[in-house]
């Protein structure tokens, strides 16, 4: 197993069967070895810098009915909200004062017409020309993505969720299309966005083979960012009784992704911190180099509930940057306030 990890670190690619063997053969020794190589790899590209992004959860209205998600359309108990433009701008103003130079606007799909997205992006771009603007608002036609890019957005996060069509269809309702999700990712990259994909670890019906396909997809697609976190069930979804994904497997996969794509921007996700008290710090040691503290209005944060028991210790809040800096420094890294664009390999 260690020889496969060595070859991945050297060549940045494996066969699908070799990826499957790596996933299925995970052990404590393999995970520690992969993490050490991943940490060395990220230090060679990014040093000990950890980039922070100010996350603004702009609304939890969603047209989709994904079987794993707490803000799915069918959840009648979800307390819906949508931030107005002035509130979003106020969040950015607070974030800028705190030192953030990237804002991430994330929300349910289909709730924000492209014209409104472009208007908000244009206003943020005019107010903060030195900042990066990341959007994570789901699937749109290519022309809409182009308008967002021309309005001033730099990055777009759209998790592919799984690179296996049959698995995708088990996680999503029939009106959602695996082909369309992949089309969106290709469009985003072609338009010029720094493009991010991602997936859950431990989702229902996931296998070593489907995870191997995720790794092979990342190898082929070469994303600039990749969001990976454990599946965590939400009580108001069809997957409420499934077990959560494992922190250990998530960390191992983060390390493998860093070896596949040395210059990738790899978040230590809130979901990982939610299943393991020191999950985000462990993620940094396993190859992650991005953290996204929450800039959303405090009154709305609990409403953006994608999964149960979302981390709420304080360190995930943008207002507690001092705590975050201390936690990151304690494991040997440094929070920086740069835009943190992807570096050329």
Regions found by a protein language model. Give the residues of each.
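Short, small-residue-enriched loops and turns at beta-alpha junctions
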Residues: 59-60, 109-113, 174, 202-207, ...
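Conserved, mostly hydrophobic/aromatic
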Residues: 11, 38, 66, 158, ...
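Auxiliary Fe-S-binding modules of radical SAM enzymes
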Residues: 1-29, 96, 219-345
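Canonical Radical SAM [4Fe-4S] cluster-binding loop centered on the CxxxCxxC motif
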Residues: 46-87
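Alpha-helix-loop-beta-strand connector modules within alpha/beta enzyme cores
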Residues: 113-137, 177-194, 242-264, 316-328
């Amino acid at each position: 197993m260690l020889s496969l990890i060595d070859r991945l670190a050297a060549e940045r690619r494996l066969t699908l069967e070799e990826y499957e063997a790596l996933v299925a053969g995970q052990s404590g020794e393999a995970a520690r070895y992969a993490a050490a190589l991943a940490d060395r790899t990220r230090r060679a590209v990014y040093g000990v810098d950890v980039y922070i992004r100010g996350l603004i959860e702009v609304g939890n209205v969603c047209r989709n009915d994904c079987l794993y998600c707490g803000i799915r359309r069918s959840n009648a108990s979800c307390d819906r909200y949508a931030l107005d433009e002035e509130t979003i701008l106020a969040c950015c103003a607070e974030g800028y004062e705190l030192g953030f130079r990237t804002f991430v606007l994330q929300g349910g799909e289909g709730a924000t017409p492209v014209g409104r997205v472009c208007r908000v992006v244009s206003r943020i771009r005019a107010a903060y020309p030195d900042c990066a603007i990341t959007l994570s608002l789901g699937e749109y036609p290519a022309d809409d993505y182009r308008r967002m890019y021309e309005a001033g957005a730099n990055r777009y996060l759209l998790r592919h969720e799984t690179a296996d069509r049959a698995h995708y269809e088990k996680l999503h309702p029939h009106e959602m299309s695996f082909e369309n999700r992949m089309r969106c990712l290709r469009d985003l990259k072609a338009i010029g966005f720094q493009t991010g994909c991602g997936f859950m670890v431990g989702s229902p019906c996931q296998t070593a083979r489907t995870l191997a396909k995720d790794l092979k997809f990342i190898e082929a697609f070469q994303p600039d960012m990749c969001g990976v976190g454990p599946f965590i069930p939400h009580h108001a979804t069809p997957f409420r009784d499934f077990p959560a994904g494992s922190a250990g497997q998530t960390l191992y996969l983060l390390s493998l992704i860093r070896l596949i794509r040395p210059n990738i921007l790899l978040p230590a996700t809130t979901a990982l911190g939610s299943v393991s008290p020191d999950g985000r710090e462990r993620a940094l040691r396993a190859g992650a180099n991005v953290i996204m503290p929450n800039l959303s209005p405090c009154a709305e944060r609990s409403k953006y509930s994608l999964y149960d028991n979302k981390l709420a210790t304080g360190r995930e809040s943008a207002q507690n940057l001092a705590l975050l800096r201390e936690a990151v420094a304690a494991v040997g890294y440094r929070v920086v306030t740069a835009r943190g664009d992807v570096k050329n390999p």
